[in-house]
Curated annotation (Swiss-Prot):
Belongs to the HesB/IscA family. InterPro entries: FeS_biogenesis, FeS_cluster_insertion, FeS_cluster_insertion_CS, HesB-like_dom_sf. It comes from the Bacteria. May be required for efficient nitrogen fixation. Pfam families: Fe-S_biosyn. One of its GO terms (biological process) is iron-sulfur cluster assembly. This is Protein HesB, heterocyst. GO terms for molecular function: 2 iron, 2 sulfur cluster binding; 4 iron, 4 sulfur cluster binding; iron ion binding. The gene is hesB1. The keyword Metal-binding does not apply. The keyword Transmembrane does not apply. Keywords: Heterocyst, Nitrogen fixation.
């Protein structure tokens, strides 16, 4: 399972996780990434702060950020790159997903075609 955080995304997440810690010893927090049905294109990205992975989550580390990926969402997220972009009007995380056949204008939801090695549709 490959999820890549750019340097800017890792920096922002690290700062956010440090700021959300309840005490100085809390260092096990990470982010959990998944997708759900929704959004204007079919699937919607979810990114939550968590201290514990779910039993079937795939776990990796990007820099000093723990990344938990929902196992059911993994085929849809394989190879995703998460960046943090800043602009005049808005700033936020940008998802570049090689499995997306199209994305909505806001970039928060996507449509996926065949994203599994066996040729089984993602949905």
């Amino acid at each position: 399972m490959t999820v890549t955080l750019t340097e800017k995304a890792e920096f922002r997440l690290r700062a956010f996780l440090r700021g959300s810690a309840k005490d100085a010893n809390e260092t096990t927090k990470g982010i959990r990434i998944s997708v759900k049905d929704g959004g204007c294109s079919g699937y919607e990205y979810l990114m939550d702060v968590t201290s514990q992975p779910q039993p079937d989550d795939l776990v990796s580390q990007q820099g000093s950020v723990l990344v938990y990926v929902d196992a059911k969402s993994a085929p849809l997220l394989e190879g995703i790159v998460i960046d943090f972009v800043e602009g005049l009007v808005e700033s936020g995380f940008k998802f570049t997903n090689p499995n997306a056949t199209s994305t909505c204008g806001c970039g928060k939801s996507f449509k996926a075609g065949d994203c599994s090695p066996e040729g089984v549709p993602c949905s």
